[in-house]
Protein backbone atom coordinates (compact mmCIF):
# COMPACT_ATOMS: atom_id res chain seq x y z
CA UNK A 1 0.00 0.00 0.00
CA UNK A 2 1.26 3.48 -0.83
CA UNK A 3 2.56 5.17 2.34
CA UNK A 4 0.56 8.34 1.66
CA UNK A 5 -2.64 6.34 1.16
CA UNK A 6 -1.93 4.49 4.39
CA UNK A 7 -1.44 7.68 6.39
CA UNK A 8 -4.38 9.38 4.68
CA UNK A 9 -6.70 6.48 5.58
CA UNK A 10 -5.94 6.71 9.32
CA UNK A 11 -8.75 7.84 11.57
CA UNK A 12 -8.48 11.45 12.67
CA UNK A 13 -10.17 13.70 15.21
CA UNK A 14 -10.27 16.42 12.54
CA UNK A 15 -12.89 17.20 9.93
CA UNK A 16 -10.89 20.06 8.40
CA UNK A 17 -7.81 21.62 9.98
CA UNK A 18 -7.82 24.75 7.83
CA UNK A 19 -10.36 26.45 10.09
CA UNK A 20 -7.79 26.45 12.91
CA UNK A 21 -5.23 28.32 10.80
CA UNK A 22 -4.95 31.94 11.94
CA UNK A 23 -4.86 32.97 8.27
CA UNK A 24 -8.39 31.63 7.69
CA UNK A 25 -10.88 34.50 7.48
CA UNK A 26 -14.28 33.49 8.90
CA UNK A 27 -17.59 35.10 8.00
CA UNK A 28 -17.82 36.51 11.52
CA UNK A 29 -15.21 37.83 13.94
CA UNK A 30 -16.59 37.49 17.48
CA UNK A 31 -15.77 40.34 19.88
CA UNK A 32 -14.28 42.55 17.17
CA UNK A 33 -17.50 44.11 15.88
CA UNK A 34 -16.62 47.48 17.40
CA UNK A 35 -13.21 47.60 15.69
CA UNK A 36 -14.72 46.58 12.33
CA UNK A 37 -17.31 49.33 12.65
CA UNK A 38 -14.61 51.87 13.54
CA UNK A 39 -12.74 51.14 10.31
CA UNK A 40 -15.95 51.08 8.28
CA UNK A 41 -17.09 54.51 9.48
CA UNK A 42 -13.93 56.00 7.93
CA UNK A 43 -13.73 53.81 4.83
CA UNK A 44 -17.38 54.40 3.91
CA UNK A 45 -16.31 57.79 2.56
CA UNK A 46 -14.64 56.00 -0.36
CA UNK A 47 -18.06 54.85 -1.59
CA UNK A 48 -18.91 58.53 -2.09
CA UNK A 49 -15.69 59.19 -4.02
CA UNK A 50 -13.88 60.78 -1.07
CA UNK A 51 -10.45 59.52 0.01
CA UNK A 52 -10.79 58.30 3.63
CA UNK A 53 -8.42 59.44 6.39
CA UNK A 54 -5.44 57.29 7.30
CA UNK A 55 -5.91 54.78 10.12
CA UNK A 56 -3.47 53.16 12.54
CA UNK A 57 -4.43 50.07 14.52
CA UNK A 58 -2.45 48.85 17.52
CA UNK A 59 -2.60 45.70 19.58
CA UNK A 60 -0.59 42.75 20.84
CA UNK A 61 -0.04 39.67 18.70
CA UNK A 62 -3.21 37.61 18.27
CA UNK A 63 -5.72 40.38 19.02
CA UNK A 64 -7.34 40.19 15.58
CA UNK A 65 -5.76 43.20 13.86
CA UNK A 66 -4.93 41.51 10.54
CA UNK A 67 -8.20 39.56 10.45
CA UNK A 68 -10.26 42.71 11.07
CA UNK A 69 -8.38 44.66 8.39
CA UNK A 70 -8.88 41.88 5.83
CA UNK A 71 -12.52 41.50 6.85
CA UNK A 72 -13.08 45.24 6.32
CA UNK A 73 -11.31 45.05 2.94
CA UNK A 74 -13.58 42.20 1.88
CA UNK A 75 -16.72 44.04 2.98
CA UNK A 76 -15.66 47.26 1.22
CA UNK A 77 -14.94 45.37 -1.99
CA UNK A 78 -18.43 43.84 -1.91
CA UNK A 79 -20.08 47.21 -1.19
CA UNK A 80 -18.13 48.98 -3.96
CA UNK A 81 -19.66 46.73 -6.64
CA UNK A 82 -22.87 48.73 -6.36
CA UNK A 83 -21.34 52.20 -6.62
CA UNK A 84 -19.76 54.17 -9.45
CA UNK A 85 -16.35 54.55 -7.81
CA UNK A 86 -13.11 52.75 -8.68
CA UNK A 87 -11.99 51.49 -5.26
CA UNK A 88 -9.00 49.18 -4.84
CA UNK A 89 -7.83 47.53 -1.63
CA UNK A 90 -4.33 46.08 -1.36
CA UNK A 91 -2.71 44.25 1.54
CA UNK A 92 1.07 44.39 2.07
CA UNK A 93 2.90 42.40 4.75
CA UNK A 94 6.00 44.43 5.58
CA UNK A 95 7.94 41.33 6.60
CA UNK A 96 7.79 40.28 2.93
CA UNK A 97 8.30 43.72 1.37
CA UNK A 98 10.78 45.55 3.58
CA UNK A 99 11.70 48.66 1.55
CA UNK A 100 9.83 51.55 -0.03
CA UNK A 101 10.88 50.41 -3.51
CA UNK A 102 9.59 46.85 -2.95
CA UNK A 103 6.23 48.03 -1.61
CA UNK A 104 5.66 50.56 -4.40
CA UNK A 105 6.69 47.98 -7.03
CA UNK A 106 4.28 45.47 -5.48
CA UNK A 107 1.43 48.00 -5.51
CA UNK A 108 2.14 48.89 -9.14
CA UNK A 109 2.04 45.21 -10.12
CA UNK A 110 -1.16 44.58 -8.18
CA UNK A 111 -2.75 47.57 -9.88
CA UNK A 112 -1.78 46.40 -13.37
CA UNK A 113 1.62 47.97 -14.11
CA UNK A 114 4.46 45.62 -15.05
CA UNK A 115 7.41 47.05 -13.12
CA UNK A 116 10.60 45.31 -11.94
CA UNK A 117 11.45 44.71 -8.28
CA UNK A 118 14.90 46.13 -8.95
CA UNK A 119 16.71 48.14 -11.59
CA UNK A 120 14.66 51.34 -11.69
CA UNK A 121 15.48 54.49 -9.79
CA UNK A 122 13.29 55.46 -6.86
CA UNK A 123 11.98 58.45 -8.85
CA UNK A 124 10.95 56.19 -11.76
CA UNK A 125 9.01 53.75 -9.58
CA UNK A 126 7.32 56.55 -7.56
CA UNK A 127 6.30 58.49 -10.69
CA UNK A 128 4.88 55.32 -12.26
CA UNK A 129 2.82 54.73 -9.12
CA UNK A 130 1.54 58.30 -8.88
CA UNK A 131 0.57 58.42 -12.56
CA UNK A 132 -1.88 55.58 -11.93
CA UNK A 133 -4.07 57.95 -9.93
CA UNK A 134 -4.82 60.23 -12.84
CA UNK A 135 -8.17 59.91 -14.63
CA UNK A 136 -8.52 56.49 -16.19
CA UNK A 137 -10.11 55.61 -19.52
CA UNK A 138 -13.59 55.72 -17.97
CA UNK A 139 -13.05 59.13 -16.40
CA UNK A 140 -13.01 57.70 -12.88
CA UNK A 141 -10.52 58.51 -10.16
CA UNK A 142 -9.08 55.45 -8.46
CA UNK A 143 -9.10 55.41 -4.66
CA UNK A 144 -6.57 53.03 -3.13
CA UNK A 145 -6.86 51.66 0.38
CA UNK A 146 -3.49 50.14 1.23
CA UNK A 147 -3.02 48.04 4.38
CA UNK A 148 0.56 47.96 5.68
CA UNK A 149 0.82 45.09 8.16
CA UNK A 150 3.70 45.15 10.67
CA UNK A 151 4.72 48.57 9.39
CA UNK A 152 7.19 49.05 12.26
CA UNK A 153 9.46 46.44 10.64
CA UNK A 154 9.65 48.43 7.41
CA UNK A 155 10.20 51.71 9.27
CA UNK A 156 13.10 50.25 11.25
CA UNK A 157 14.61 48.72 8.13
CA UNK A 158 14.10 51.51 5.58
CA UNK A 159 12.92 54.67 7.29
CA UNK A 160 9.71 56.62 6.59
CA UNK A 161 10.17 57.21 2.84
CA UNK A 162 7.22 54.96 1.98
CA UNK A 163 4.83 56.93 4.19
CA UNK A 164 6.17 60.16 2.70
CA UNK A 165 5.39 58.88 -0.81
CA UNK A 166 1.94 57.50 0.02
CA UNK A 167 0.76 60.52 2.02
CA UNK A 168 1.71 62.77 -0.87
CA UNK A 169 -0.07 60.70 -3.52
CA UNK A 170 -3.64 61.75 -4.32
CA UNK A 171 -6.45 59.31 -3.50
CA UNK A 172 -4.39 56.96 -1.33
CA UNK A 173 -5.53 56.02 2.17
CA UNK A 174 -3.22 54.07 4.49
CA UNK A 175 -4.20 51.60 7.19
CA UNK A 176 -1.11 50.80 9.28
CA UNK A 177 -0.96 47.79 11.60
CA UNK A 178 1.57 47.46 14.41
CA UNK A 179 2.15 45.42 17.57
CA UNK A 180 4.46 48.20 18.73
CA UNK A 181 2.55 51.14 20.15
CA UNK A 182 5.56 53.47 19.89
CA UNK A 183 6.36 52.76 16.24
CA UNK A 184 5.76 56.41 15.32
CA UNK A 185 9.07 57.32 16.89
CA UNK A 186 10.55 56.04 13.61
CA UNK A 187 8.55 58.66 11.64
CA UNK A 188 9.97 62.15 11.12
CA UNK A 189 7.76 65.12 12.14
CA UNK A 190 7.19 66.28 8.53
CA UNK A 191 5.75 62.86 7.61
CA UNK A 192 3.83 62.46 10.85
CA UNK A 193 2.08 65.79 10.28
CA UNK A 194 0.80 64.69 6.87
CA UNK A 195 -0.31 61.27 8.15
CA UNK A 196 -3.08 62.72 10.37
CA UNK A 197 -4.27 59.22 11.19
CA UNK A 198 -7.15 57.94 13.29
CA UNK A 199 -6.07 55.42 15.92
CA UNK A 200 -7.91 52.22 16.86
CA UNK A 201 -6.70 50.08 19.78
CA UNK A 202 -7.29 46.33 19.92
CA UNK A 203 -7.45 45.10 23.53
CA UNK A 204 -6.41 41.53 24.41
CA UNK A 205 -9.15 38.91 24.33
CA UNK A 206 -10.47 37.71 27.67
CA UNK A 207 -10.72 34.01 28.52
CA UNK A 208 -14.47 33.80 27.80
CA UNK A 209 -14.05 35.64 24.51
CA UNK A 210 -11.39 33.10 23.51
CA UNK A 211 -13.79 30.29 24.44
CA UNK A 212 -16.37 31.79 22.07
CA UNK A 213 -13.82 31.99 19.23
CA UNK A 214 -12.56 28.44 19.77
CA UNK A 215 -16.05 26.98 19.99
CA UNK A 216 -16.98 28.48 16.61
CA UNK A 217 -13.81 27.21 14.95
CA UNK A 218 -13.96 23.77 16.60
CA UNK A 219 -17.42 23.03 15.16
CA UNK A 220 -15.95 23.36 11.67
CA UNK A 221 -12.63 21.68 12.47
CA UNK A 222 -13.30 18.62 14.65
CA UNK A 223 -15.57 15.63 14.42
CA UNK A 224 -18.50 15.60 16.81
CA UNK A 225 -17.49 14.45 20.28
CA UNK A 226 -13.77 14.65 19.54
CA UNK A 227 -13.01 17.25 22.22
CA UNK A 228 -12.99 16.50 25.93
CA UNK A 229 -15.02 19.03 27.92
CA UNK A 230 -12.01 20.77 29.45
CA UNK A 231 -10.04 21.23 26.21
CA UNK A 232 -11.46 24.53 24.96
CA UNK A 233 -11.60 26.21 28.41
CA UNK A 234 -7.99 25.12 29.02
CA UNK A 235 -6.79 26.46 25.66
CA UNK A 236 -8.60 29.73 26.36
CA UNK A 237 -7.19 30.05 29.89
CA UNK A 238 -3.62 29.43 28.73
CA UNK A 239 -3.98 31.92 25.86
CA UNK A 240 -5.55 34.53 28.15
CA UNK A 241 -2.36 34.39 30.23
CA UNK A 242 -0.41 35.04 27.01
CA UNK A 243 -1.95 38.53 26.74
CA UNK A 244 -5.21 37.28 25.19
CA UNK A 245 -3.58 35.81 22.09
CA UNK A 246 -6.23 34.16 19.88
CA UNK A 247 -3.56 32.92 17.46
CA UNK A 248 -1.89 31.07 20.32
CA UNK A 249 -5.25 29.62 21.42
CA UNK A 250 -5.87 28.26 17.90
CA UNK A 251 -2.33 26.84 17.74
CA UNK A 252 -2.87 25.08 21.06
CA UNK A 253 -6.13 23.52 19.91
CA UNK A 254 -4.74 22.41 16.54
CA UNK A 255 -1.53 20.98 18.04
CA UNK A 256 -3.48 19.14 20.74
CA UNK A 257 -5.58 17.56 17.98
CA UNK A 258 -2.44 16.53 16.11
CA UNK A 259 -1.08 14.91 19.28
CA UNK A 260 -4.37 12.99 19.62
CA UNK A 261 -3.94 11.68 16.06
CA UNK A 262 -0.33 10.67 16.75
CA UNK A 263 -1.49 8.71 19.82
CA UNK A 264 -4.35 7.09 17.85
CA UNK A 265 -6.78 8.65 20.33
CA UNK A 266 -10.34 9.31 19.23
CA UNK A 267 -10.57 12.19 21.71
CA UNK A 268 -8.51 15.33 22.37
CA UNK A 269 -7.65 15.43 26.09
CA UNK A 270 -6.57 18.21 28.42
CA UNK A 271 -3.18 16.52 28.83
CA UNK A 272 -2.65 16.89 25.07
CA UNK A 273 -3.23 20.65 25.42
CA UNK A 274 -0.50 20.84 28.09
CA UNK A 275 1.86 18.90 25.82
CA UNK A 276 0.96 21.23 22.96
CA UNK A 277 1.83 24.23 25.16
CA UNK A 278 5.35 22.91 25.83
CA UNK A 279 5.87 22.08 22.15
CA UNK A 280 4.68 25.47 20.91
CA UNK A 281 6.66 27.42 23.50
CA UNK A 282 9.87 25.60 22.58
CA UNK A 283 9.43 26.19 18.86
CA UNK A 284 8.26 29.78 19.27
CA UNK A 285 11.31 30.82 21.29
CA UNK A 286 13.67 28.94 18.98
CA UNK A 287 12.19 30.62 15.89
CA UNK A 288 12.46 34.07 17.49
CA UNK A 289 16.10 33.59 18.48
CA UNK A 290 17.16 32.15 15.12
CA UNK A 291 15.71 35.13 13.25
CA UNK A 292 17.32 37.79 15.46
CA UNK A 293 20.10 39.93 13.96
CA UNK A 294 23.57 38.68 14.94
CA UNK A 295 24.20 41.62 17.28
CA UNK A 296 21.05 40.87 19.28
CA UNK A 297 22.06 37.21 19.46
CA UNK A 298 25.37 38.35 20.97
CA UNK A 299 23.49 40.39 23.58
CA UNK A 300 21.46 37.28 24.45
CA UNK A 301 24.68 35.28 24.64
CA UNK A 302 26.05 37.81 27.14
CA UNK A 303 22.83 37.63 29.20
CA UNK A 304 23.05 33.82 29.16
CA UNK A 305 26.68 33.94 30.34
CA UNK A 306 25.85 36.25 33.25
CA UNK A 307 22.71 34.29 34.15
CA UNK A 308 24.66 31.02 34.40
CA UNK A 309 27.21 32.77 36.62
CA UNK A 310 24.31 33.99 38.79
CA UNK A 311 25.49 37.58 38.41
CA UNK A 312 23.20 40.56 38.73
CA UNK A 313 22.79 41.82 35.16
CA UNK A 314 23.00 45.58 34.86
CA UNK A 315 23.19 47.29 31.48
CA UNK A 316 26.79 48.33 32.21
CA UNK A 317 27.92 44.80 33.09
CA UNK A 318 26.00 43.41 30.12
CA UNK A 319 27.82 45.79 27.78
CA UNK A 320 31.21 44.69 29.15
CA UNK A 321 30.49 41.02 28.45
CA UNK A 322 28.86 41.78 25.11
CA UNK A 323 32.00 43.62 23.90
CA UNK A 324 34.15 40.62 24.82
CA UNK A 325 31.86 38.33 22.80
CA UNK A 326 31.66 40.73 19.84
CA UNK A 327 35.49 40.95 19.61
CA UNK A 328 35.80 44.34 17.98
CA UNK A 329 32.52 44.14 16.04
CA UNK A 330 30.41 45.79 18.73
CA UNK A 331 27.74 48.49 18.63
CA UNK A 332 27.49 51.53 20.88
CA UNK A 333 26.33 51.45 24.49
CA UNK A 334 23.28 53.51 23.49
CA UNK A 335 22.35 50.96 20.81
CA UNK A 336 22.41 48.21 23.45
CA UNK A 337 19.45 49.93 25.14
CA UNK A 338 17.47 49.59 21.89
CA UNK A 339 18.34 45.88 21.77
CA UNK A 340 17.27 45.42 25.39
CA UNK A 341 13.90 47.07 24.66
CA UNK A 342 13.37 44.89 21.58
CA UNK A 343 14.31 41.66 23.40
CA UNK A 344 11.93 42.58 26.22
CA UNK A 345 9.16 43.27 23.70
CA UNK A 346 9.74 39.76 22.30
CA UNK A 347 9.37 38.28 25.79
CA UNK A 348 12.91 36.88 25.95
CA UNK A 349 14.01 39.09 28.85
CA UNK A 350 12.47 41.38 31.45
CA UNK A 351 13.84 44.58 32.98
CA UNK A 352 13.24 46.12 36.36
CA UNK A 353 14.40 49.57 37.44
CA UNK A 354 15.68 49.62 41.04
CA UNK A 355 16.89 52.44 43.24
CA UNK A 356 20.42 52.12 44.65
CA UNK A 357 19.67 54.54 47.48
CA UNK A 358 20.16 58.23 48.05
CA UNK A 359 22.75 59.71 45.72
CA UNK A 360 23.36 56.46 43.85
CA UNK A 361 20.68 56.78 41.19
CA UNK A 362 18.59 54.06 39.57
CA UNK A 363 19.72 50.96 37.68
CA UNK A 364 18.07 48.61 35.19
CA UNK A 365 18.28 44.95 36.21
CA UNK A 366 17.85 42.44 33.37
CA UNK A 367 16.48 38.91 33.80
CA UNK A 368 16.28 36.07 31.29
CA UNK A 369 12.70 34.89 30.68
CA UNK A 370 13.38 31.55 28.99
CA UNK A 371 15.21 28.41 30.09
CA UNK A 372 18.99 28.58 29.72
CA UNK A 373 19.05 25.14 28.07
CA UNK A 374 16.57 26.28 25.42
CA UNK A 375 18.61 29.42 24.75
CA UNK A 376 21.78 27.34 24.41
CA UNK A 377 20.07 24.98 21.96
CA UNK A 378 18.80 27.90 19.90
CA UNK A 379 22.08 29.83 19.82
CA UNK A 380 24.52 26.98 19.36
CA UNK A 381 22.46 23.90 18.48
CA UNK A 382 23.94 21.86 21.32
From Swiss-Prot:
**One Pfam family from the record:** Cdc6_lid
Q: Describe PTMs of this protein.
A: Autophosphorylated on a serine. Phosphorylation is stimulated by binding to MCM. Both single-stranded DNA and double-stranded DNA inhibit the phosphorylation reaction.
What keywords does the record list, in alphabetical order? ATP-binding, DNA replication, DNA-binding, Nucleotide-binding
Biological process, per Gene Ontology: DNA replication
InterPro entries (alphabetical): AAA+_ATPase, AAA_22, Cdc6_C, Cdc6_lid, ORC1/CDC6, Orc1/Cdc6_arc, P-loop_NTPase, WH-like_DNA-bd_sf
User: Does Nucleotide-binding show up as a keyword for this record?
Assistant: yes
Question: What positions does the entry give for ATP binding?
Answer: 63-67, 205, 217
Gene3D superfamilies (UniProt xref): 1.10.8.60, P-loop containing nucleotide triphosphate hydrolases, Winged helix-like DNA-binding domain superfamily/Winged helix DNA-binding domain
Q: Which GO terms describe its molecular function?
A: ATP binding; ATP hydrolysis activity; DNA binding
Q: Which family does it belong to?
A: Belongs to the CDC6/cdc18 family.
UniProt xrefs under PANTHER family: CELL DIVISION CONTROL PROTEIN 6 HOMOLOG, CELL DIVISION CONTROL PROTEIN 6-RELATED
| Domain remark from Swiss-Prot or TrEMBL | The N-terminal AAA+ ATPase domain and the C-terminal winged-helix (WH) domain are both required for DNA binding.
Q: Subunit arrangement?
A: Monomer. Interacts with MCM via the WH domain.
Q: Which NCBIfam families match?
A: orc1/cdc6 family replication initiation protein (TIGR02928)
Protein role: Involved in regulation of DNA replication. May play an essential role in origin recognition. Binds to DNA, with a preference for origin-specific double-stranded sequences. Does not bind single-stranded DNA. Inhibits MCM helicase activity but does not affect its oligomeric state.
Q: What is this protein called?
A: ORC1-type DNA replication protein 1
Which organism does this sequence originate in? Methanothermobacter thermautotrophicus (strain ATCC 29096 / DSM 1053 / JCM 10044 / NBRC 100330 / Delta H)
Name the gene that codes for it.
cdc6-1
Amino acid sequence: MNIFDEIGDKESVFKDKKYLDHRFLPDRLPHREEQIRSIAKYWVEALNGVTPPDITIYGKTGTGKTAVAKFAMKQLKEASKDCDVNIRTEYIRCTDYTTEYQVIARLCQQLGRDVPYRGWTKAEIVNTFRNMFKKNAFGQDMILMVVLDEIDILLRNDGDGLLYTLTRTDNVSILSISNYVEFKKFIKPRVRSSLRDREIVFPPYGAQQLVDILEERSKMSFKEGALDDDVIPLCAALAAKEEGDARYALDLLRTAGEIADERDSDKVLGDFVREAKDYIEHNKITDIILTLPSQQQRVLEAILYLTKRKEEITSGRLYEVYKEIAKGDSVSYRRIFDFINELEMLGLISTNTVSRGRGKGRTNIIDLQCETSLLEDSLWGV
